[in-house]
Amino acid sequence: ACKDNFAAATCKHVKENKNCGSQKYATNCAKTCGKC
């Protein structure tokens, strides 16, 4: 299940700020963060 549960803009922002390490974002922005 490789998808972003949060809005695309939110996940883009998360990745730019290197917040993909956060469990919340790693799970909800899996596609953008490449966690799958």
Curated annotation (Swiss-Prot):
Disulfide bonds join 2-36, 11-29, 20-33. Residues 2-36 form the ShKT domain. The keyword Secreted applies. The record marks 6, 13, 22 as: Important for binding to potassium channels. One of its GO terms (molecular function) is toxin activity. Coiled coil: none annotated. Pfam families: ShK. One of its GO terms (cellular component) is nematocyst. InterPro entries: ShKT_dom (IPR003582). It comes from the Eukaryota. It is found in: Secreted; Nematocyst. Keywords: Disulfide bond, Ion channel impairing toxin, Nematocyst, Neurotoxin, Potassium channel impairing toxin, Secreted, Toxin, Voltage-gated potassium channel impairing toxin. Residues 24-25 are annotated as: Crucial for binding to potassium channels. Its main location: secreted. Blocks voltage-gated potassium channels Kv1.2/KCNA2 (IC(50)=140 nM). Belongs to the sea anemone type 1 potassium channel toxin family. Type 1b subfamily. This is Kappa-actitoxin-Avd6a. It comes from Anemonia sulcata (Mediterranean snakelocks sea anemone).
